[in-house]
């Protein structure tokens, strides 16, 4: 399992196409417009959007199979961190289960 110990970023597995990333970003802000009257606004509406998108669209972690010490992903699968708030250095925790 891969997970960032935060609630404003997510780990996901998807195609590494920059156009898809732009579509995902647009979907976040279409679903959760920053102009909405959010109640969690201490750090600005973008922070509320990040929390909502992590919880309701992405989830904050993903599982990835490991075989012979390497990620065993499909041709179009790539694991990446989705930054939903402010760019910053992030930690990603890894948990390994099994043999």
For each predicted feature, which ranges?
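Active-site histidine-anchored catalytic micro-motif
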Residues: 1-99
